[in-house]
Structures are given as C-alpha cells and as structure tokens.
C-alpha cells in the first residue's frame, strides 16, 4: 500500500472519512474548502467559515463535489452508512437539531421525520436498517428511540422525561 498526500495545508477542511467501498472521501469543512465550491453567497458577502458543509472527494481524479451547497441547515456531523449507502447528517437550524439523509449518488437530501426537535446524537447499525438516537423537545427531557431506516418507523425505547418530570404538573 502506498501513501499519498491528498492535500497540504488544506484551509477550511475539518476532517474526512472513507466511503463504505473505500473509493471516495466524505469531507467536512466550510463552503470555502476546495477553492470555494461550497459557497452559496452573493458577491460581496463574507462567508461564514463555521457553516458546516459536506463534500465528496475522489482521490483517483482529485476532484471534489459540494454535497450541501444549496442545503440551508449547518451540518455538524455525518456518517456514511454501510448498510444503505446513504449519508446521515446531524444538522443545526436555528433552535432545531435534525437528521437528514443525503444520497451521495445523486445529491438528493431528505429530512427524517423524527418526533423530537433537538436530536443530540445517533448511531447506525452496519448490517441492518437500524438507527438509535436520542433527543428532546420543548415539553420533554431526553428520550431514546430506535428508527428503522427502511420502513421509516420510530419506536420509543426509553423515556427519561417520564422519570425527570414525574412530579411536575
């Protein structure tokens, strides 16, 4: 196996992970990464380098593609699911933290219909259509759920809110 430098002193790139097949990289950074290909601002505006964006990078061609250039929420983290090939993104949009999927083949982004306003974290199974996540909303504390990524069904696993708020009327 040979070692190759893909970037040197790459400004605005925060990290990267391999695709499930090992042929591409999912790159985290600001819209300024890769010579500004992720920017979606008017001329004369200054970019927000804290606005998290996702890119696909092909090491063979050394070409990058902006996945979330026209996507409004800020991407805070993402995971490329081995089971279904989708990229699952945790996002921030004002007071909400939601999970979206991105199809890396066509760039189509879809919000998961999850019952909480603030999703704190999630974990994906490698060999099954299962995601566990926890979050809360304005009227409840943390709850843990299971989500079937194929059927799109959510199941409440544990309601910490019931314990925390049991004496509140």
Give the ranges of each region predicted by the language model.
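Extended amphipathic secondary-structure runs
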Residues: 1, 58-62, 77-80, 84
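A flexible loop/linker signature enriched in serine peptidases of the S9 family
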Residues: 1, 6-14, 27-55, 66-76, ...
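Short loop/turn segments that connect beta-strands within beta-propeller blades
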Residues: 58-62, 103-107, 148-152
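Residue-level recognition of a conserved intra-blade site in WD40 beta-propeller repeats
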Residues: 18, 80-82, 124-126
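Hydrophobic beta-strand positions that form the internal "hydrophobic ladder"
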Residues: 22-26, 86-87, 129-132
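Non-catalytic accessory segments flanking enzyme active sites
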Residues: 1, 15, 110-169
């Amino acid at each position: 196996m040979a070692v190759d430098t893909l970037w040197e002193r790459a400004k605005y790139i925060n990290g990267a992970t391999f695709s499930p097949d090992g042929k591409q990289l999912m790159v985290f950074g600001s819209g300024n990464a890769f010579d500004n290909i992720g920017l979606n601002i008017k001329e004369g505006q200054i970019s927000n380098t804290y606005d998290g964006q996702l890119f696909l990078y092909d090491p063979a061609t050394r070409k990058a593609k902006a996945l979330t250039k026209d996507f409004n929420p800020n991407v805070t983290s993402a995971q490329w699911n081995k089971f279904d090939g989708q990229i699952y993104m945790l996002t921030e949009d004002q007071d909400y933290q939601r999970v979206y999927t991105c199809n890396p083949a066509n760039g189509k982004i879809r919000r998961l219909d999850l019952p909480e306003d603030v999703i704190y974290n999630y974990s994906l199974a490698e060999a099954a259509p299962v995601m566990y996540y926890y979050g809360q909303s304005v009227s409840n504390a943390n709850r843990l759920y299971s989500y079937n990524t194929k059927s799109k069904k959510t199941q409440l696993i544990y309601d910490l809110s019931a314990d925390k708020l049991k004496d509140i009327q």
